[in-house]
Structures are given as C-alpha cells and as structure tokens.
Amino acid sequence: MEVRVINTYKEIRNYITRVKNGDSPALCWEEEVVSVYWEHLCCYAPFDLSERKPCVITDIAALERQCDLLEQLDVVTLAHEFERVTAILPNYDDDPITVVLFPSDNGNTTVNEKQNGVVGTSLFGNLYIQVNPLVTGYENWIRYVFAHEYHHTVWGNYWFMLHRGELDNKFIDSLVIDGEADSFAMELYPTLQPQWLFHLSEDEITCLWKERYSKIVNSTEVDYTTYMFGNEKQNIPWCAGYAVGYRLVQNYLAMSEKNVIEILETKPEILLYGLDTIRKI
C-alpha cells in the first residue's frame, strides 16, 4: 500500500511569519497549516471531523525550534517503514494513505512526559501525527503511533464500513479497538513500553476491572473520555481504559492461541467470554 508522508514545517514557518506580523494566531493556523491538508485528510470520512483538527499553537519561540528539527526529519525512511507496517496488516482496500506530520504544543506536558512527544489521530483512512522534536527520542515513537492509528483504520474499515451495523456501540468496542491497536504496535516494536499501558500495577488494573470496567463494558451510555483517558475526580487513573483494554486483548490472545491480526474480525464482546474470573485479566 502506498503511504505518503507530509512534513508541514514549511507551512508552520508561514504561520510563524504571519503571527509575528500581528495577524490572528487562530486565523493564521487555520489558513496556513490546517486547511492546506484538511479536506484531503478527511476525504474517506463518512461524516464531518472538524472537531479533530489540531489546535492552534501560540508558543512561537518553541515552534521555531521545532521547525528547525522537523526539517531534518527523514520522511522517506518513515514512509518506507509505514508501508512495511501496512504490508503486515493489509487493509480491505488499496486506497493510498496520507500521513501529515504536525508539531505538537510544547506546553502540553502530558504529551511530552507521558506520550513521548507523539500523538496520532485517525481520520477514516488518512491520519495525522503530532510530534514534538524537542522531546528526546520522539522519532522512535512516530512508527509506534502510526502502527496504532493504522490499526484503527483497518479495524474501522472492517467494522464501520464493510460490516456497518453489526456492532452495538457498547463500551467494550472502545476497549477492544485500542487494546488491539496497542497489541499490534507492541508486537511490531516490543522494545517500546508505552506509559499508558504500563503505568499501573497489575493489582491496580485488576481492581479497576472488578470495581468499574466489568460493570460498564456492555453499556452504550458510558462517559468515553472519563473511562478511556481517566478522571482524577472520579478516581479513574490516566489512560486506564487503554491499560484495561490491552490486558483484555492480551488475555484473549493467550487463551485463543490466535494472533492480533486474526482477531481483528472477532466481535469485541467475544473477547469477554474467557473472563470468567478477574484473575484472568
């Protein structure tokens, strides 16, 4: 599958120039950075995805340093690696994929300290990855994040397009899609240890499953942000849903003796069948 990687450092420099000249950061960001690629990025999407646009960055000093480093990024090598990933997990069509690299806000301490300076967003085929080259080792995580987001593309193509209507929009779907995506990326890059999967002890995850997640997996009315990304006020740790989903998938893989690619077409609730005791998660 053809994968095209676009580095936006030139557009970012245009944005910086306009902001320094006194123009509105929000307007310039939209005109110089986002709108240049947004229509193409969303060309496969079945509905409007405007809420997923990358947010404006106003720290111009940091952005200038990021641009200098982004310009040095080898996008050709990245594209080859991304194509290797797509060959391991073929999609259900041959549509080419575009990956746009935007900078991430240097002021986002969560991304910098817990996500290695790299986050991705899937847009029903194409995707974008936000990177902070000021974070040490960020380059290694671009490929992991691509693998994770690309798995979303394939999973979504199967369940939301080819088999539309066969899922019941239960919370188990959310746990499984990210659990499988991280399982896929971890198999490709086993030396990388994402904090969002391993920041909690196994006892903590077991407790979360027993007291919280096992009670809501079949619900269609779940606060997604709280239970996937965490909520300190409700005692849900950061990214707890990712950690729980990953263990759920890993448990099923061990019991079924299948691999992570083979279970992509397995309905999410089936992954629960083996969880007859909390010990197994």
Q: Residues of each region from the PLM?
A:
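Hydrophobic, aromatic-lined core segments that form the binding pocket/scaffold
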Residues: 121-123, 130, 154
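Auxiliary, metal-adjacent structural segments of Zn-dependent hydrolase domains
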Residues: 62-124
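Inter-helical turn/loop segments and adjacent helix faces that build the functional surface
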Residues: 136-137, 160-169, 190-199, 255-262
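N-terminal low-structure segments adjacent to metalloprotease catalytic domains
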Residues: 1-73
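Post-HExxH zinc-binding segment in Zn-dependent metallohydrolases
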Residues: 2-4, 8-11, 166-208, 279-281
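Short pre-active-site segment immediately N-terminal to the catalytic Zn-binding motif
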Residues: 131-146
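Active-site recognition of the HExxH zinc-binding catalytic motif
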Residues: 144-157, 178, 182
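Pan-zinc metallopeptidase signature
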Residues: 214-281
